[in-house]
């Protein structure tokens, strides 16, 4: 089973790394994970950080940066539309996945 973590963001680079760490640190599960980040024209270096994190984490990170702010509702839809998983789990960019959450999903 594949799970898409759909994350809309805007100028939250300081928080996204903690969220990605919490996803990466999940254990005892056999789920396929992808992360889909829709960036609402951030100006805080989010795109540069995403490029570094792609090499660091054990799951694909799909990233789309909008050239202008499209509003929160369209940014959420953009993140969801990127996902290819059987399930979509929408996370705020400042959320943290609790330990063993993916194992409990199975």
Language model features: what each stretch is:
Residues 1-106:
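Nucleotide-sugar donor-binding/catalytic module of glycosyltransferases
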